């Protein structure tokens, strides 16, 4: 099985507000994460990864596939209260 790689476009790093690149990588590399289809604000289709940082902070990371085993990190944000509720339900159902 091939290793999955992640890359950051420069513009995506510039758009991180209140979230460190390290926190994003924690979510992407944790064993428990919830992949879901999503859309960016401009309508771009992406894969979203819902997960927690090592400190337990719930984040959503947006990815766009660049190559078969390579993904670009194009977005990251904190979950809304409603999303946290949905994510916690998923966590309980998928222990």
What positions do the PLM features span?
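Ribonuclease/tRNase effector modules and their secretory precursors
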Residues: 1-95
């Amino acid at each position: 099985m091939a290793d999955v790689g992640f890359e950051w476009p420069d513009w995506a790093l510039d758009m991180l507000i209140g979230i460190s690149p390290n926190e994003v990588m924690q979510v992407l590399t944790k064993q428990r994460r919830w992949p879901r289809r999503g859309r960016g604000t401009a309508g771009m289709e992406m894969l979203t990864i819902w997960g927690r940082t090592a400190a337990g902070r719930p984040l959503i990371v947006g990815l766009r596939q660049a190559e078969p085993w390579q993904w670009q990190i194009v977005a990251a944000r904190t979950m809304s209260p409603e999303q946290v509720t949905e994510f916690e339900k998923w966590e309980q159902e998928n222990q």
